[in-house]
Each structure stands twice: as C-alpha cells, then as structure tokens.
Amino acid sequence: MKKFILLIIFYLIYFISFSQKTKSEKVSVEKSILSIQTGYFGTWINHELKLHNQFALRTEIGTEYRLKFAIKQSFDSLKNQVSIFLEPKYYFNLIKRESKNKNIKNNAANYISLRTNFNILNNLENGEIYFHTLTPTYGIRRNITSHFNLELSFGYGISYSNSVITLEAMPSFRFGYVF
C-alpha cells in the first residue's frame, strides 16, 4: 500500500510540474494572421505577425481616403491614396478578456499602436509624397463570426509632405475577413 501511495504522489508531482505556466504565459496573440478589410475610408490587405505574447507587428497595403488638417489652417482636403503601413501593436487586455471567457481568437482585443506609413501613389501632378510618422493609435477588434471581424481605431499624428508638417486625424471603421 505504501508503494502504491508513493507511486500516486510521484505521478501527481510529475504531472503538476509540467503545468506551471501562468495565465499570462498561456494567453497570447495569434502567431500569424492574414486578412482583408474594408471600411468607409478604404480597403486594405494586412498581415499580423506575433512578436511576443501581447505584441504583434502588422504590415498592410491598401487604398484609403484621409482627412488632412494643416497646423495653422482649417480643413485642407480629403485625399485618396495607396499606402503601405508598418504598425507594431500592443494588445493590453488579452488576459482580462480570456479570464472573462470572452473570444480572443484572431487577436480580438483592445490595442494601442504606433502607425508609420508611406504613400505610394498620391497627388502625382503636384509631386506630393507623404511620409507619416508618430501616429499613436487606440483601437478595438471584435469577432463577429469565426472569420469575420470588426475593427475600430482612432489616431492623431504628424505627417511630413514637401517640407510641410501637418496634423492628421486617422479614424478607422473596418469590417474584415480573416483567411
């Protein structure tokens, strides 16, 4: 009987020792996500790559409309442009959503990010090329079904174009499909 009890204790210790991951180590962003999104402000194809448990790097190409406001002027223009984005994201409430048994598949959580982009085609007649930097963004992504999602975000950042610095509001309302 002693041997049997020792054997059970040994097996319990053995199995418990392999389940030592904390909840924060178990909850993580998806390894790789490829999706297409459309919204009022444009259409995009994007890819998110896991960097760490709560960090992802999003690369994106798309066409979009952008509101532009000059620093010392009023409303300037509404432009359509093709853009390439590079956006590191920090998903800050993955653990909280998981603990409440909410869906976090395909990185369905709140995030903050720092967007950078380069516009490929813009106003070619005037030779304008915009390079956007320092656009902090807050957003949320929620799943509608297993492949469809909704993403809302807002950022306000600085852009540089032909030696002119402007401030830009970057609202986004996107409906997407994850492959």
Locations of regions flagged by a protein language model:
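Bacterial Sec-dependent N-terminal signal peptides
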Residues: 1-27, 175-179
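Short loop/turn motifs that connect adjacent beta-strands in outer-membrane beta-barrel proteins
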Residues: 21-31, 54, 93-109, 144-148
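Start-of-domain marker
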Residues: 24-68, 73-77
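Residues that define the transmembrane beta-barrel architecture of outer-membrane proteins
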Residues: 28-34, 39-43, 78-84, 128-134, ...
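Transmembrane beta-strands of outer-membrane beta-barrel proteins
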Residues: 32-36, 57-61, 84, 108-116, ...
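Transmembrane beta-strands of outer-membrane beta-barrel pores
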Residues: 38-42, 61-67, 90-92, 116-122, ...
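Outer-membrane beta-barrel strand-turn architecture
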Residues: 49-53, 92-94, 120, 142-146, ...
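Outer-membrane beta-barrel "beta-signal"
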Residues: 82-98, 167-179
